[in-house]
Amino acid sequence: MEFPFDVDALLPERITVLDQHLRPPARRPGTTTPARVDLQQQIMTIVDELGKASAKAQHLPAPITSASRMQSNRHVMYILKDTSARPAGKGAIVGFLKVGYKKLFVLDDREAHNEVEPLCILDFYIHESLQRHGHGRELFQHMLQKERVEPHQLAIDRPSQKLLKFLNKHYNLETTVPQVNNFVIFEGFFAHQHPPARKLPPKRAEGDIKPYSSSDRESGLPQGW
C-alpha cells in the first residue's frame, strides 16, 4: 500500500509499534525533519487507510481500526513496511496487526464462567498483493515476542476463516473452546493464564439458599462471597 509521502523515512524500522499516542518514531540521523504535527498527521493517515483496507477485505460495514479509535483505546498496532518497495523512493506498507488487553467473561471446557483479561487480536490485515509471502507470520511472530505471550494465550475477536486457517497452519491452533460472545479462544487457554483466571461463583438455582455460618451472619454476607 503506497502513500503520497515518504513512508520509508517516516517509519525507519521494518516493523513499527504504535500506541494510543500515535507518535512518529525517531528519525534516522541525517534525514530532514518536517514539523512534528505533519508527521503525526501522516501516521494518522496510514492508520486510517489501513483500517479501511482491512474492513473492505473482511466485508465489514465500517472500519474497526482508525486513528480516532486508536487514540481513545489502549490498543497497540504493529505496522509492517515493505523495505523492497520504493515507488519514487517513498516505500510502502505491507499490513498491520492490532492487539489490546480486554476484560472478558469466557467459558472453560466445563462451561464455567471465568473473568480474564487476555491479550486480544483485534484486527489483522496483509495487502492482497503481498499475501502468502510470509509477511503475516513475520508480523505475528514479532508481536508474540514483543508482548511475551504464547499463541494459545490469545483471544481473537471475530476471526475470519482465513485467520483461523493461518493460526492452525503456523501455530497448530485448531480446537476451540465454545463461547457465547464474539471472541474465540483455543484449547490450552486456561492452562497458561497469568495472572490466573478468576472463576465466578456458579449461579444458584432459585430457592437453593445456602445456610449462613455464624461468621457469615456477623459479616452480613452470605457464604461464598
Swiss-Prot record:
Q: Which residues bind acetyl-CoA?
A: 124-137, 160-169
Q: Which InterPro entries match?
A: Acyl_CoA_acyltransferase, Atat, GNAT_ATAT
Subcellular localization is given as: Cytoplasm; Membrane, Clathrin-coated pit; Cell junction, Focal adhesion; Cell projection, Axon
Q: Report residue spans for region: Disordered.
A: 195-225
Q: Which UniProt keywords apply?
A: Acetylation, Acyltransferase, Cell junction, Cell projection, Coated pit, Cytoplasm, Cytoskeleton, Membrane, Transferase
Record GO biological process: alpha-tubulin acetylation; microtubule cytoskeleton organization; neuron development; regulation of microtubule cytoskeleton organization
Q: What class of enzyme is it?
A: transferase
Could you confirm whether the keyword Phosphoprotein appears in this record?
no
User: MF terms per GO, please?
Assistant: L-lysine N-acetyltransferase activity, acting on acetyl phosphate as donor; tubulin N-acetyltransferase activity
The family database entries (Gene3D superfamilies) matched by this protein are listed as: 3.40.630.30, 6.20.370.120
Q: Where does this protein have compositionally biased stretches of type Basic and acidic residues?
A: 203-219
Q: Post-translational modification, briefly?
A: Autoacetylation strongly increases tubulin acetylation.
**Residues marked Crucial for catalytic activity (site):** 58
Which superkingdom heads the taxonomic lineage of this protein's source?
A: Eukaryota
Annotated N-acetyltransferase domain residues: 1-190
One Pfam family hit: Acetyltransf_16
Q: Which reaction does it catalyse?
A: L-lysyl-[alpha-tubulin] + acetyl-CoA = N(6)-acetyl-L-lysyl-[alpha-tubulin] + CoA + H(+)
N6-acetyllysine modifications at: 56, 146, 210
Q: GO CC terms for this protein?
A: axon; clathrin-coated pit; cytoplasm; focal adhesion; microtubule; spindle
* Record-listed E.C. numbers: 2.3.1.108
Q: What does this protein do?
A: Specifically acetylates 'Lys-40' in alpha-tubulin on the lumenal side of microtubules. Promotes microtubule destabilization and accelerates microtubule dynamics; this activity may be independent of acetylation activity. Acetylates alpha-tubulin with a slow enzymatic rate, due to a catalytic site that is not optimized for acetyl transfer. Enters the microtubule through each end and diffuses quickly throughout the lumen of microtubules.
Per the record, the similarity remark reads: Belongs to the acetyltransferase ATAT1 family.
Q: How does it assemble?
A: Component of the BBSome complex. Interacts with AP2 alpha-adaptins, including AP2A2, but not with AP1 gamma-adaptin (AP1G1/AP1G2); this interaction is required for efficient alpha-tubulin acetylation, hence clathrin-coated pits are sites of microtubule acetylation.
- What protein is this chain from? Alpha-tubulin N-acetyltransferase 1
The species is Bos taurus
